[in-house]
Each structure stands twice: as structure tokens, then as C-alpha cells.
Amino acid sequence: LPEQSSLVLSLHRVGVKFPIKKGLLNRVKDYFVAVKPLDLSLNRAESIGIVGESGSGKTSLALAIARLIESTGNIVLLNQNLNRLTERQLRPLRKDFQMVFQDPFSSLNARMTIEQIIGEGLGLQKLSKAEISSRIDEALLKVELPIDFKQRYPHELSGGQRQRVALARALVLRPKLIILDEPTSALDRTTQRAIVKLLRQLQADYQISYLFISHDLQVVKALCQRIL
């Protein structure tokens, strides 16, 4: 067993099921099981890949771990059981785990500048304007984007650049865990390789743990020490 201090995330019998409602009264008649109960442990600076076809429940699992949908079982992040916390109790912990989605264009607000997008989560922290600006600059440099991209909008960037912005938005909060849901599937092979290389470098620099969800075994093997 890994030593307790290095354990970032552990799942115990975590499952996801959606109610099937029928009839005039819209009563629950049955459940669709999206994720069968599973156990998992993830250490600091480790990457685990979850591979499966579309519809296999991979995204449901990611959303459950991020507490964006309900699940059964125990999700323990940094010794806190997320499934036992209210949304209010969860809020200060959200900086410790971030999610990067498949399509950066739909997950980035088209009306916001890159600076506003990356800095959005910092508004909840007690930081001065200068500190926020400095953190945004640092995040842009870490994902290898020019500082002057701050004034641009998502539609002005390529797919690969938008995914780097999505990573910078996660990174700026200095999380312990990043959940990546098909983060390279909308990108060409060359851009995929560049993003995987960047993820490796960020992990080495910040000791971040990754839960990497993909149907692409080649990409998963390039990044992950373990594959489920």
C-alpha cells in the first residue's frame, strides 16, 4: 500500500447510476448503470489512464469524481470524503481538483478574454490584483503561450492553443489533481504529442496527479504509469 501522505485520491465502491422514469407520475422504474462500483487509488505525481469506448461511462466517472454529478461510494481526496460534503463545504476544496474537458471551445466562455478565463477561479481567493495578474502570467508561460494572449478571445486561438488555455485555467489554482476528459481527442497527432509533452513537464514541475480519460490507448500509454 502507498504511504498515506502520498495518496491524493482513493475511490471505494464508487458507482454512477441514472434513474429511468416512466408513466404519468414520472416515477423511477429502474436505473441505468453508467459506472459499476470500482476502487482506485492515485498517488502524488502519478497518472492513471482510464480507457474505454464511447458510452462506457468514462465521462460519468470523471464528473462524479469532480462532484458534478451524484455517485455512490466514497471519493476521498486529500483525506476528505467528497461524497459526504455539502456544496458549501466542497467549495474551498475545489481549487485542489480541476477538470479539463474534451472540447476547449465549448468549455471556454466566448465572451471572456483569455485573462478573464484563466483568472476566473482566483476571484474566490484573497489575492491582490497584482498577485492575480502575476499568477495568470505564470500559468500562460507554463503552458507555453505568449503573455500578450491575455487580451485575446477563444475564437482567435487554434484548438491546441485553446486546450493550453484550459490547462492554464486549471493550473493557476495550483491543484493537486487534474481530471482530463479526452483532452487531446479534438486535436491532430502533432498537437496531441505537444500537449502530452506539456502535461509531463507540468507534472514534473508541480507534482500534480492526473486522471486521464481517453479512448486513445496510444496517448494514454504516452502519459500514464497505470491503465485501467
Locations of regions flagged by a protein language model:
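ABC ATPase NBD coupling module
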Residues: 25-29, 82-98, 116, 124
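Conserved ABC transporter NBD signature motif
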Residues: 73-81
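Conserved ABC ATPase "signature" region
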Residues: 130-148, 201
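Hydrophobic anchor residue at the start of the ABC signature
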Residues: 167, 195
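A short, proline-enriched helix->beta-strand linker immediately N-terminal to the Walker B motif
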Residues: 172-176
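A short, surface-exposed alpha-helical micro-motif characterized by mixed small hydrophobic
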Residues: 220-222
